[in-house]
């Protein structure tokens, strides 16, 4: 009896293979398709409207530079005035601005571009590499390969001329870019054959090394190799052959940068580098001596070769004197000179003997030599001063006033005159008290009455208080 057939396989659940049978335990408001959901008709998944609808991302890009067809032969109305294309205006034209556009010349009319409707998603709009064609980088690779071929040809040519093979050197020597402009302290931060200081003494029982923090306590010991290395840390050697070593290293780097020659490596081939440096120095000295000899033959100067004492004293010489400068660049404790103004001083114009602003009067600046208020005027000297004083006296009326000394003399004379007049008046008054018989019998005459009226003081007269005074009212 044959075995029974296997049970049928249950269909896969999901968006593609969903169950055709409805689940009675799913509520109606979930399983019912809303009115706005699109019904494809053939879909058997009654819960499709509840599943995540994954759509393919549109990452398309327009074809840059694609045209609709061949270019027109003459200018068309409404086209770009610069290039003649119908798909854009002159303000949106990306072609080179012409002195005379295609509208006026009718030449070199560009074809119409294909305007594509590119609708991208959120990620596609923000993709910096969207639309990039990797084939564009092929031009960079080709340029690099051409330069590499030229470099190899030059090396082969140089090897044929010199008669020795040029080694390529290790990868580090070719790819490292140690510029001569880079500080020496940066290039020599760490040597590859250097040993870390915490590896010099790994004795766990020693008080010098702390295994927990992996540090050496108190900078190591005092009389061993570790202490010597710590003493040299951060110290730039300037004695012995340090300067010569720096020159040799710099020469090797410059030779590699200029010609790509790695045979003058300082550590790999120090003898060749030293020989080439010595040879180059001898050639430079020979050229300099030859140049000096030619100049002496042409212009002479054997007798003036020795520098004069004045020039020799002006030369900068080394000194051990310690000099300290302040924040503005002056020597501390040095003599303080008079600060010079940035403006020109003691420069007199137009025959003046003083500068403008050396005299002040009536809220005005002027020249003290001639009392002139006009800037850049011609100096008149003492005559100008006298003219100015006369003008001031005429303007203020000070010339009508008496000098102080004359006023004192006149005051004394006036007092004497008043005293004499007072005595005369007193004597006349005493005499006037004695009336004659005629005066006692007779009446007042017309002349006496008129004199009385003339001499009578009117109290209402505003000038009455000034009577008897000889002072000038100003």
UniProtKB/Swiss-Prot annotation:
Q: Which GO terms describe its molecular function?
A: pre-mRNA 3'-splice site binding; zinc ion binding
Q: Where in the cell is it found?
A: Nucleus
Q: Does the keyword S-adenosyl-L-methionine apply?
A: no
Tell me the segments the record calls region Disordered.
263-296, 395-437, 453-474
Which biological processes are named by the entry's GO terms?
Answer: mRNA splicing, via spliceosome
Entry's InterPro entries? Slu7_dom, Splicing_factor_SLU7
The organism's superkingdom is given as Eukaryota
GO cellular component terms, alphabetically, are: spliceosomal complex
Disulphide-bonded residues = none
Q: Where does this protein chiefly localize? A: nucleus
Which keywords are on file for this protein?
Answer: Metal-binding, mRNA processing, mRNA splicing, Nucleus, Spliceosome, Zinc, Zinc-finger
Q: Where in the chain are the CCHC-type zinc fingers? A: 78-95
Functionally, this protein is described as follows: Involved in pre-mRNA splicing.
Q: Which family does it belong to?
A: Belongs to the SLU7 family.
What subunit structure does UniProt give? Associated with the spliceosome.
Q: What is this protein's name?
A: Pre-mRNA-splicing factor SLU7
- Source organism of the structure: Pyricularia oryzae (strain 70-15 / ATCC MYA-4617 / FGSC 8958)
């Amino acid at each position: 009896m044959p075995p029974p057939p296997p049970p049928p396989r249950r269909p896969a659940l999901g968006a593609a293979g969903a169950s055709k049978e409805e689940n009675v335990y799913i509520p109606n408001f979930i399983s019912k398709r809303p009115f706005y959901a699109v019904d494809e008709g053939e879909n058997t998944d009654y819960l499709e409207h509840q599943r995540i609808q994954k759509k393919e991302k549109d990452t398309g890009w327009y074809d840059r530079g694609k045209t609709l067809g061949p270019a027109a032969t003459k200018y068309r109305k409404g086209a770009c005035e610069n290039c003649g294309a119908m798909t854009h205006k002159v303000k949106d034209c990306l072609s080179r601005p012409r002195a005379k556009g295609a509208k006026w010349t009718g030449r070199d009319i560009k074809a119409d571009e294909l305007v594509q409707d590119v609708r991208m998603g959120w990620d596609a709009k923000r993709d910096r590499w969207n639309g990039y064609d990797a084939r564009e980088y092929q031009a960079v690779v080709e340029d690099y390969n051409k330069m590499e071929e030229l470099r190899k040809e030059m090396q082969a040519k140089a090897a044929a001329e010199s008669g020795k093979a040029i080694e390529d050197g290790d990868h580090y020597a070719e790819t490292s870019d140690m510029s001569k402009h880079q500080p020496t302290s940066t290039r020599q931060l760490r040597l590859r054959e250097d040993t870390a200081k915490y590896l010099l003494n790994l004795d766990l029982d020693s008080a010098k090394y702390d295994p927990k923090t992996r540090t050496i306590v108190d900078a190591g010991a005092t009389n061993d190799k570790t202490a010597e290395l710590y003493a040299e840390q951060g110290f730039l050697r300037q004695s012995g052959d340090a300067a010569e070593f720096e020159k040799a290293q710099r020469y090797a780097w410059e030779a590699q940068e200029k010609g790509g020659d790695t045979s003058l490596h300082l550590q790999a081939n120090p003898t060749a580098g030293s020989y080439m440096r010595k040879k180059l120095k001898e050639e430079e000295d020979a050229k300099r001596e030859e140049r000096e000899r030619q100049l002496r033959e042409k212009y002479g100067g054997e007798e003036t070769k020795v520098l004069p004492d004045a020039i020799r004293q002006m030369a900068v010489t080394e000194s051990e004197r310690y000099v300290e400068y302040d924040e503005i660049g002056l020597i501390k404790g040095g003599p303080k000179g008079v600060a010079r103004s940035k403006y020109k001083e003691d420069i007199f114009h137009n025959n003046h003997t003083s500068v403008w602003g050396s005299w002040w009067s009536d809220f005005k600046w002027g020249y003290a030599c001639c009392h002139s208020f006009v800037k850049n005027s011609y100096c008149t000297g003492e005559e100008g001063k006298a003219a100015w004083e006369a003008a001031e006296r005429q303007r203020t009326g000070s010339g009508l006033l008496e000098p102080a000394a004359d006023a004192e003399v006149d005051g004394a004379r006036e007092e004497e005159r008043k005293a004499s007049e007072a005595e005369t008046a007193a004597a006349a008054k005493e005499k006037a008290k004695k009336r004659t018989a005629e005066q006692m019998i007779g009446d007042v005459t017309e002349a006496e009455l008129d004199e009385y009226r003339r001499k009578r003081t009117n109290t209402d007269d505003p000038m009455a208080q000034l009577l008897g005074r000889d002072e000038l009212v100003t």
